A protein has these predicted regions:
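Aromatic- and acidic-residue-enriched carbohydrate-binding clefts of CAZyme catalytic domains
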Residues: 1-7
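Conserved NTP/Mg2+-binding pocket subregion across the NTase superfamily
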Residues: 66
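Catalytic core of soluble alpha/beta enzymes
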Residues: 39-40
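Loop/helix patches that line or flank the sugar-binding groove of alpha-linked glycan CAZymes
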Residues: 7, 11-27, 35, 44-56, ...
Length: 239
């Protein structure tokens, strides 16, 4: 886009990188770049001395019912970046329904099979080159909250177009850390949260899922620990 092509933007990114590099410890700068040619934008902004990686939208745009579409989305993303850590992948973020709702629910699976598919998507994402971006709740196999009253919505799109379009609040409800309800399930000690806590999420709280053997969280954590010990997974120049 015209904005991204401004030389001043690239100069600013280089200055920003110098500031980040002046600190000790691990640092990672990722840019959310979209435009007419996001791959070209990624190449430009991850040149030496700029960002470490850019956010990739290809898997966010996959509908979930088409295996060939998934293969095409991955191939298009890695085609010009094969072997580079400058890529990142995400199935969900704060602007689209979670993968459990957008990509898996249309399959009509049982709860157990949907959990298995959620774990499979997470493992697939973590097996691709580059960085993995897991959106809050994916590791718990959470689906979106689609029964938020209009009076409690915050997203202008949802307020304007519900019930035809529920907006983005459905994937933005508070993270549920524990089953206790007296502190918004561990999320906040405030008298009110920005969006309501989802009752169905309380049964999959972070603490409980982390302790439950065989949960998506448990299995994905073990997979990531295994992945970190596989040189081919960490350093290979292809999927």
């Amino acid at each position: 886009s015209a904005q991204l092509n401004q030389p001043a933007i690239q100069t600013f990114i280089e200055q920003f990188r110098k500031v980040a590099d002046s600190y000790s410890g691990d640092r990672f700068l990722m840019g959310e770049l979209h435009g007419d040619d996001p791959t070209l934008a990624s190449e430009t902004f991850t040149a030496p001395g700029r960002l470490h990686a850019t956010y990739n939208f290809s898997l966010l745009e996959w509908g979930g019912l088409d295996v060939d579409g998934l293969k095409s989305a991955i191939s298009a993303a890695i085609g010009r970046f094969n072997g580079s850590g400058r890529l990142s992948f995400a199935f969900s973020n704060h602007d689209v329904p979670r993968s459990a709702t957008r990509q898996l629910a249309p399959l009509g699976l049982s709860e157990d099979d949907q959990e298995a598919m959620q774990l499979l998507l997470l493992k697939l994402e973590a097996s691709l080159i580059g960085s993995t971006c897991v959106y809050q709740g994916e590791e718990l196999a959470l689906s979106d909250v689609q029964d938020i009253p209009i009076s409690q919505m915050q997203d202008p799109w949802g307020i304007e177009f519900a019930p035809l379009f529920l907006g983005r609040d459905t994937c933005r409800t508070p993270m549920v850390w524990e089953k206790a309800k007296n502190n918004w399930s561990g999320f906040s000690e405030a008298s009110k949260t920005w969006l309501p806590i989802a009752e169905k999420h309380i049964q999959r709280s972070g603490i409980d899922e982390a302790a439950r053997s065989g949960s998506v969280y448990d299995q994905f954590s073990k997979f990531l620990a295994w992945r970190a010990q596989q040189p081919a997974m960490v350093h290979a120049n292809s999927m």
